[in-house]
Amino acid sequence: AKKRTGKELAEWKYQRYMHDYLRVIHSVDRNIGIVLDYLEKNDLLDNTLIVYTSDQGFYMGEHGWFDKRFMYEESFRTPLLMRLPGGKKGDIPQLVQNIDYAPTFLELAGAPIPADIQGESLLPLLKGERPENWRNSLYYHYYEYPAEHSVKRHYGVRDDRYKLIHFYNDIDVWELYDLQEDPHEMNNLYGKPSYEAVMKRMRDELYKLQKQYDDPVGIRFNVSD
């Protein structure tokens, strides 16, 4: 076998990776079609909530990274497609999380939703409603370090425009991004005097969510800074 090195090796690995990735997409598309065909043939299509989602997004070389775990948009944003018979069509702008799936399924099944569950049912959004008290920010915490993926521990908060991330434990690095002006998160604004008010607001929101979700580790490192 030919021995590859340097740029040639990197390009070969990338092409092999992309071929596998595209084969997975083709397989997912084919198998979703099989499920939809079955539901239609058995008169179940208009009586079934269809959900396609994933645990996280995936990097395809962005930020020099393949895989997931970091809180940057390519990984943080998770695919979610839902088809509710008679439900709203098109995009839903509200911020949702995977912790919302369980209460959604429970409500649709007519089962009680435990009081201590952290998510919110998506059923109102699927029906086209806009709840006034819907969340305006999202919390994230990655803590599996040291581990084989070598992703530093970090937590953060994202609202409809800004994202604040804190890498902690054996390092202490803060990052702030304006997702409207810098959607690829290439320009860290943390520490810039002109963003002092944004930093304070996002730090306050971060602390609020850490208390809401009962994250003592995040609170300890956030407050101690």
Task: Name each model feature, range by range.
Residues 1-98, 108-116, 166-174, 183-186, ...:
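Active-site-proximal cap/lid insertion segments
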Residues 56-62, 83, 88, 99-102, ...:
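C-terminal cap/loop subdomain of S1 sulfatases and analogous C-terminal strand-loop tails that border
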Residues 189:
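Cysteine-centered loop/knuckle micro-motif
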